[in-house]
Amino acid sequence: MSASPKNEMWVVFKRLMAYVVPMKAMFIMAVLGLITYGAVDAAFIAFIKPFIDEGFSQTPAIVAGVDLPTHGGFNANKDIMLMAPIAVILMFSLRGVANFVSTYCVSYMSAQLIMDMRQQVFEHYLRLPVSYIDRENSGNLISRVTFDTEQIARASGSALISIVRDSMTAIGMLGIMFYYSWKLSLCILVIGPIMGVVISVVSKRFRKVSKQIQSAMGGVTATTEQMIKGHKNVLVFGGQKTEVERFFQVNDRNRYQNMKLAVAQSISQPLIMVIGSFALAFVLYAATWDSMKTDLTAGTFAAILGAMLAMLQPIKNLTRVNAEFQRGIAACTTVFELLDTAPEPDNGVFSIDRVEGKLAFDNVTFAYPGQEKSALNGINFEVKPGKTVALVGRSGSGKSTIASLITRFYGDLSTGDIRLDDTSIYDYQLKSLRNQVALVSQQVTLFNDTIANNIAYAYPGEVTREQIVHAAELAYAMEFIDTLPEGLDTQVGENGVLLSGGQRQRIAIARAMLRDAPVLILDEATSALDTESEKAIQKGLDNLRHNRTSIVIAHRLSTIESADEILVIDQGKIVERGNHSELIAQAGIYANLYQMQFSQ
């Protein structure tokens, strides 16, 4: 049985408060400041009764049970009138100090909480399996770090201020009313449950709509990100109108969800005020009763009336901030669901500095998560240390899947095993396993940094300038790097947008060379190069593959003629195998592909 919404909210709130525990000193100071702020407001209203009853009367004044002395011709009511300005200045000075302390402490906690939560979400992304990232909307993933954490900050910040301060003020005002006339104040007990029902119903609505707003905001982020990444394609294919319409739809959906929240909020606040007005009207009416007149003085009535009026604003604030609080709770639920997602399994215990590089696939069958059809069926091959195996086949045949399984990017196999140096890759610690592999894929990823830092990214320790230059030379990247004004210190832009496709590919190859891993995966590593560059860099790749176990995925068959073994993959199965000469002699799929490429 699932937990009720109220219990779920309480569980989420307690988990959120766990982030505040390291800042308990700040939290205590903030609460004390908020309580003081509310108490001063209550004290100011409480001061109305003695000010009116005693300050304007001709009888000795008693304030806080103490007879005020008379002196120098000034009677008691004169002393009350002299005390009032001083009391007001002192109270509001204390109120100002309390407001500063509480606001600063809450702002500090909110900023720290949002930083800690964003850091935790970001780090958790790095531990999640590739399959999770594949199936999730990138806009939603980004929204978790940006939009959702902002909503949480509001719940922990402005909502906390209002809940503590306004609750304290409302309780203080209620206490004053019952202290001065419990009979006249009983009407509050009648409207209290009605207000509670309204707030409960509205809270559920706020929480539901808030989750819909988060989803809509994820759509806005995803659509914007997609347009920016495909900006050139949008322009060249004239897709501006399509993109504008697509963004309008997600943008309008986000507006609609926000309006649903605004409607609920705009209805709830006046409704609370109307309910409160009935209580106020009842007090005014009850004050005319003969039974009440004997207990009421002008000061008592003014204090009760002032307390009721002063209590309406905190109640209104609590209703208003309830929307922010529910949005924060909804965002917390989404973020905590993400943080509760199981990280990439890492049950291996075996660790090694460097393997020899013997790689074997033993009857491997694999299906992607959520897919019934197997991507690979009964794959068997072995690569001896320092040897090269090339994978050839149509797009979608399973070549990249084989490469992804070597690094354990995806979960367990359906059948079979993959061994590295006669040890199952699932027995290795993930970090140790991936330290043995260098990868150059057809989708080059460069970071918004210098060329030098992008090349050095894959190196596990400190790297010298000479090592970076040497790797770039082997990748034939120095040819274009030397022509740049800042050389290796040139900024490449986001994902290398300031470089050509071939230049980005060479930097990626230089990065793999610098890593110096015993196992090398080249997934269409020369696909973005022109013919002249391909011939030049092929020499560098031949040097890179020397004494390294290499898995080469290629469509250009000219780049794999020297491979020790070539596997032809079709529909997840190995349909042909052998070296270049043997496969040509077989006159099968490989021979046909080779003939087609070289006849063009």
Swiss-Prot record:
Residue span, ABC transporter domain: 359-596
The ABC transmembrane type-1 domain, residue ranges: 28-327
GO annotation, cellular component aspect: plasma membrane
Stored Gene3D superfamilies: ABC transporter type 1, transmembrane domain (1.20.1560.10), P-loop containing nucleotide triphosphate hydrolases (3.40.50.300)
Catalytic activity annotation: ATP + H2O + lipid A-core oligosaccharideSide 1 = ADP + phosphate + lipid A-core oligosaccharideSide 2
Membrane topology: Multi-pass membrane protein
Family annotation (NCBIfam families): MsbA_lipidA
Subunit structure: Homodimer.
Name of the protein this chain belongs to: ATP-dependent lipid A-core flippase
Organism from which the protein derives: Shewanella frigidimarina (strain NCIMB 400)
Organism phylogeny: Bacteria, Pseudomonadati, Pseudomonadota, Gammaproteobacteria, Alteromonadales
